[in-house]
Amino acid sequence: MPFCLTETSLPFGKKYKGKVRDTYDLGDQLILVTTDRQSAFDRCLAAVPYKGQVLNLTSVWWFKNTQSIVPNHLIAVPDPNVAIAKKCKIFPVEFVVRGYISGSTSTSLWTQYQKGVREYCGITFPDGLRKNQKLESPVITPTTKETIHDRPISPHEIVAEGWMTQEDWDETSSYALRLFQHGMEVAQQHGLILVDTKYEFGRDAEGRIVLVDEIHTPDSSRYWLFNGYQERFDAGKEPENIDKEFLRLWFVDHCDPYKDEVLPQAPQELIVTLASRYIQLYEMITGESFVYDSNPGPVNDRILHNIQHWLG
């Protein structure tokens, strides 16, 4: 796809390449560039036009929308794909907040519940819950940020194993639940259900706890359509969503994405559909119209120009 941002090459500090974001270290600040890379199975599957812009601007919208709840690391947005952020010391715990019992992966809450697990991450769940049911109140099922696999962990273990102090856990977990409650309310006003999400927190140079990374994006969160949810749940049907799962399924059907060294190229119409779904989600989540880039040149050049202009 022409003008997709898959790689960045910028003359600013040391570069760290993640699955989706490229980070440039300026010392006390970070340049976070969200690319169009579509990741799954621990590898890059494809490039999706405008995906990076959707993720970055969705996060920016939520950062601005939630700063009265908790401060965040955002400093400036010099380009639709770029956020300038404070460098923070990140807590090694991901705050996974769930409003519904759902999921299909091996670590998902519903998969564990189906196996008979009733205590998960220190939370006791009652018998009789059904898949996709709304929980009585949102819960945090934290995971540790480890090199190979993230591990579900209870708040007691987080403190006992030295991942965080009790005081820091109490403050961050309170922020996480308040952010999620606000996110659910805003999503419902926009015709969506915020099903679950993950947050990351850090401590800035002044010692304050701040929200970092991303917030309520289509990559860090699951959204369902609000209209029709209850009727579908009562009928035992899956909720309607605007999902990216179909791209993963295409690769599973056409190769072994875990073992095959070279992956087949996803059909162009699949990529176009995925791009339109990301844009649709952005417009539903934020209630704002998506602004397409009118510059037909390489995205990396545009980003370089905009960052240089911001730096003065």
Curated annotation (Swiss-Prot):
Pathway: Purine metabolism; IMP biosynthesis via de novo pathway; 5-amino-1-(5-phospho-D-ribosyl)imidazole-4-carboxamide from 5-amino-1-(5-phospho-D-ribosyl)imidazole-4-carboxylate: step 1/2. The gene is purC. GO terms for biological process: 'de novo' IMP biosynthetic process. CDD domains: SAICAR_synt_Sc. Keywords: ATP-binding, Ligase, Nucleotide-binding, Purine biosynthesis. Coiled coil: none annotated. Transmembrane segments: none annotated. This is Phosphoribosylaminoimidazole-succinocarboxamide synthase. NCBIfam families: PRK12607.1 (NF009251). GO terms for molecular function: ATP binding; phosphoribosylaminoimidazolesuccinocarboxamide synthase activity. The keyword Ligase applies. One of its GO terms (cellular component) is cytoplasm. It comes from Legionella pneumophila (strain Lens). It catalyses: 5-amino-1-(5-phospho-D-ribosyl)imidazole-4-carboxylate + L-aspartate + ATP = (2S)-2-[5-amino-1-(5-phospho-beta-D-ribosyl)imidazole-4-carboxamido]succinate + ADP + phosphate + 2 H(+).
